[in-house]
From Swiss-Prot:
SUPFAM superfamilies: Ribosomal protein S7 (SSF47973). This is Small ribosomal subunit protein uS7. Signal peptide: none annotated. Keywords: Ribonucleoprotein, Ribosomal protein, RNA-binding, rRNA-binding, tRNA-binding. GO terms for biological process: translation. It comes from Brevibacillus brevis (strain 47 / JCM 6285 / NBRC 100599).
Length: 156
């Protein structure tokens, strides 16, 4: 926590091809070792694969996938009288997109396809169809929150 006042959020610039800040954030999540060009190539090639396979606009598919992956509730550990409770809390909109993008990238990295482009494209298409590991993660998060609903009054 800063001592000199609130931290201002840095805004990302929209990407040059799709003119979308979400795409830039996805590129930033994909990027390893500062290699933005490599991350951009991976994403744009994945979008080409999506366009080829579905015949739909890849941006629409991506936005639908992200909507299906973003969690509404999550649990946060809260210590009360020597016991730790998993307290369900609502996820703020900014964190929703951050978690959605993070899960999509992480689970696409763990997939079995040959190239990262194929993995990312398949994970996005799976998420758009409400299947895939990232959607399962969201479902598990919601289940945890539902199971711990009894501790909701410990919210702060």
């Amino acid at each position: 926590m800063p001592r000199k006042g609130p931290v201002t959020r840095r805004d990302v610039l929209p990407d040059p091809i799709h003119n979308s800040k979400l795409v830039t954030r996805l590129i930033n999540r994909l990027m390893l070792d500062g290699k933005r060009g490599v991350a951009q190539n991976i994403l744009y090639n994945a979008f080409d694969i999506i366009q080829e396979r579905t015949g739909r606009n890849p941006m629409e598919v991506f936005e639908e996938a992200l909507k299906n992956v973003m969690p509404v509730l999550e649990v946060k550990a809260r210590r009360v009288g020597g016991a730790n409770y998993q307290v369900p809390i609502e996820v703020k909109p900014e964190r929703r997109t951050t978690l959605g993008l993070r899960w999509m990238v992480n689970y696409s990295r763990n997939r079995g396809e040959k190239t990262m482009e194929q993995r990312l494209a398949n994970e996005i298409m799976d998420a758009a169809n409400n299947t895939g590991a990232a959607v399962k993660k969201r479902e598990d998060t919601h289940k945890m929150a539902e199971a711990n609903k009894a501790f909701a009054h410990y919210r702060w």
